[in-house]
Curated annotation (Swiss-Prot):
Higher taxonomy: Eukaryota, Amoebozoa, Evosea, Eumycetozoa, Dictyostelia
A GO CC term attached to the entry: membrane
Stretches of the chain forming a coiled coil according to its record: 134-202
Membrane-topology annotation of the record: Single-pass membrane protein
Designated name of the protein: Putative uncharacterized transmembrane protein DDB_G0281105
Length: 239
């Protein structure tokens, strides 16, 4: 079984549990060992909270400091001198004489800690509260409401961006259609110019052909007349 070790300054155990529950709604949080160190035993003057949890939950990294096994043991060794804790907790899932094993069900707000070392509890471990402070509950509800409002606002922004994106797509489609039509018009104009040029060439050729035919016809008539005159002239001299 893998564990995760958390450390948080200026926080109570209950606050840490509330934050973990808020990050893991509907999940069961198993705490294998916790050390809620308080100055002079007063609940309002908590110095730090040290937790050993199963690693199947999500951690709010912005508020907790994540420790490795050596860092956890180092901090625990510091507590050993101050609080007369004899044994360092092992990584096994079964609770030992120095471990406090408690389970926080997802359906309940609090749970009673189980421990076989009452002297350790009285000297180093703060009492686990049965009821969550109402102010903290209200604060969490306000945070949830704010998050929900932010989510709704972001969803509206996303919807607006999608609409804008669709409009841009429609604009692009329209522009593409316009470009296609312009290309077709240009091709048709080129065909028209080609036909006009061919027509002008044909007309010029036809005119030249008509001129040549007319000239040939005139020459033909001229030679016929000349031939007729010659024939008549020869017959006149013959008689």
């Amino acid at each position: 079984m893998k564990f995760i070790y958390l450390f948080k300054k200026e926080s109570t155990l209950q606050n840490c549990i509330n934050e973990l529950k808020l990050k893991n709604p509907g999940k069961e949080i198993k705490i294998h060992c916790y050390f809620d160190f308080r100055v002079n035993g007063e609940d309002k003057k908590t110095t730090f909270c040290l937790l050993k949890l199963e690693s199947n939950i999500e951690i709010p990294y912005e508020t907790f400091e994540i420790l490795n096994r050596k860092q956890f043991e180092k901090k625990f060794n510091g507590l050993e001198n101050k609080l007369e804790i004899k044994n360092i907790p092992s990584t096994s899932s079964s609770p030992s004489s120095s471990q406090l094993f408690l389970t926080l069900p997802a359906t309940s707000q609090s749970s009673q800690p189980k421990s076989t070392n009452s002297s350790t509890e009285s000297s180093s471990i703060g009492q686990f509260k049965n009821q969550v402070d109402e102010n903290e509950i209200n604060l969490n509800k306000n945070k949830i409401d704010e998050f929900q409002k932010d989510v709704i606002s972001l969803q509206q922004k996303v919807s607006s961006l999608f609409q804008q994106y669709n409009k841009e797509n429609e604009k692009n489609k329209t522009l593409n259609q316009i470009f296609d039509i312009q290309n077709k018009i240009q091709k048709m104009q080129q065909q028209i110019h080609f036909i006009q040029n061919n027509q002008e060439s044909f007309i010029t050729l036809f005119i030249n052909y008509k001129v040549k035919i007319g000239s040939a016809f005139i020459i033909y008539i001229f030679y016929n007349v000349l031939f007729f005159i010659i024939v008549r002239f020869n017959s006149f001299f013959f008689f």
